[in-house]
């Protein structure tokens, strides 16, 4: 299956880790969005929104990292690994995935993306959004090992990608003890962590270069 990506992209790293956990080989196709390669007609035909990551599995095209992750587990996963069949457990996983997209990662984007354009982060209010999001995550993890219950799921992998992005961006979340505990464990038990970290280093290099250029 073809996988269009950039190594540093948070969503791209999520899919890579999920594929690794499932034992799937991705035919990785580097797409340089900085050069506008996502706007080429052949790619827009696959994904009208021209975003990454995008997966093409035997002619079926799907994008948005969390949708890709769930698709891969539903099609190729075994038993209840990464995505239990129980409706209540799955509902909690879905809630955590939506939380990651709409609250946790969104708070990162609001505060850190301006660094790419101006060399300065977002406002104090934007920083408070990050603190609020981590407070929620810390509460979710109270008394449990994983973000959506007692086993590793796609929600852990997606949120691991996001939290590790905060780490390399030098956001200190050590005061959130449950998050710190979970993060230390998740790094050890999640397949593909090493490749996630390699992608983060690529992201950090780009991040640092943009900050310097914006000064």
Swiss-Prot record:
Q: Which UniProt keywords apply?
A: Detoxification, Transferase
Name of the protein this chain belongs to: Glutathione S-transferase D2
What job does the chain carry out? Conjugation of reduced glutathione to a wide number of exogenous and endogenous hydrophobic electrophiles. May be involved in detoxification.
What cellular component terms from Gene Ontology apply here? Answer: cytoplasm
Give the species this sequence originates from.
Drosophila melanogaster (Fruit fly)
What are the BP-aspect GO terms?
A: glutathione metabolic process
Q: Which residues bind glutathione?
A: 50-52, 64-66
Describe the protein's quaternary organization and the partners it interacts with: Homodimer.
Question: Which superkingdom, per the lineage?
Answer: Eukaryota
Q: Does the keyword Transferase apply?
A: yes
What's the Enzyme Commission number for this chain? Answer: 2.5.1.18
Q: Which InterPro entries match?
A: Glutathione-S-Trfase_C-like, Glutathione-S-Trfase_C_sf, Glutathione_S-Trfase, Glutathione_S-Trfase_N, GST_C, Thioredoxin-like_sf
């Amino acid at each position: 299956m073809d996988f269009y990506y950039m190594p540093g992209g948070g969503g791209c790293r999520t899919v890579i880790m999920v594929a690794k956990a499932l034992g799937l080989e991705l035919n990785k196709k580097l797409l340089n969005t900085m050069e506008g390669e996502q706007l080429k007609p052949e790619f827009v035909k696959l994904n009208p929104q021209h975003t990454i990551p995008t997966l093409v599995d035997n002619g079926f095209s799907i994008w948005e990292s969390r949708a890709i992750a769930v698709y891969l587990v539903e099609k190729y996963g075994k038993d209840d690994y990464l995505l239990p069949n129980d409706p209540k457990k799955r509902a909690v996983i879905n809630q955590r995935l939506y939380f990651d997209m709409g609250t946790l990662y969104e708070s990162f984007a609001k505060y850190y993306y301006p660094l790419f354009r101006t060399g300065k982060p977002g406002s104090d209010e934007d920083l408070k959004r990050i603190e609020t999001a981590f407070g929620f995550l810390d509460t979710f993890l109270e008394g449990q090992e994983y973000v959506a219950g007692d086993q590793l799921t796609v929600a852990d992998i997606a949120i691991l990608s996001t939290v590790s992005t905060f780490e390399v961006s030098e956001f200190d979340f050590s005061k959130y003890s449950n998050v710190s505990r979970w993060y230390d464990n998740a790094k050890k038990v999640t397949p593909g962590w090493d490749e996630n970290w390699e992608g983060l280093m690529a992201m950090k290099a780009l991040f640092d270069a943009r900050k310097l250029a914006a000064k």
